[in-house]
Amino acid sequence: IGFVRRRDFRRNYMQLQFTPRPTTPLIRKLRNELSFDYITTLDGRLESRQLRYLLAPEFQNGDEWWLEYNRDFEFLSKPFEIATDVVLPIGPYASESIYSAYNLGPQRPVNGWVGFIRGSFFGGTRTQVKYFGRIELSPILSVEPRISIDWINLPQGHFISKLVSGSFNYTISPRSFFSALAQYNTSTDSFSTNIRFRWEYEPGSDLFVVYTEGRQTDDRGFPVLQN
């Protein structure tokens, strides 16, 4: 859906992990993670809290399956426009969600993961489907398609948010590479691009050349330059 920068806060975070190796011939290891994130303002008022449990078996072929439970709390200190004409009012919001994903191992020429989220969301519900892929066309060339679709149902309104992006990575030499990213976001009606060149001209010293552009797509015709 998007991100908002958080200011003037204090954070406490705890994570426990236990990863046994079962004797079964199917599973290589079984990762268990429990984390707790607690964020307050500087004067001690609770802003955000997240309890998360992850169960992730890694199979003998290198693939992984993730099953995650999240229990969240968020306090909005001012109204927030989450989508066009959909404004969340001030107040506390509690939510629960289940996330499941299957991850193809990096040893495959075509790898990546596909995931699904379902749960409560700011007094309503959210269903999300996402895909992140990586295709190795050659040892020096790869492409990474990504897509995320959210179906949001809130008391203030209903909307669908789509985020589609793709990147292109080319390794020129062991010391230099070129990459390009293009992204389209329906929530903000924006299209952005990022082009980057990196050259390590001597060990420990790098030169980066980066070009970034953002355009609005809510007007008719060619997208208008935003930044």
What are these regions (language model features)?
Residues 1-227:
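Exposed, low-structure sequence patches enriched in small/polar residues
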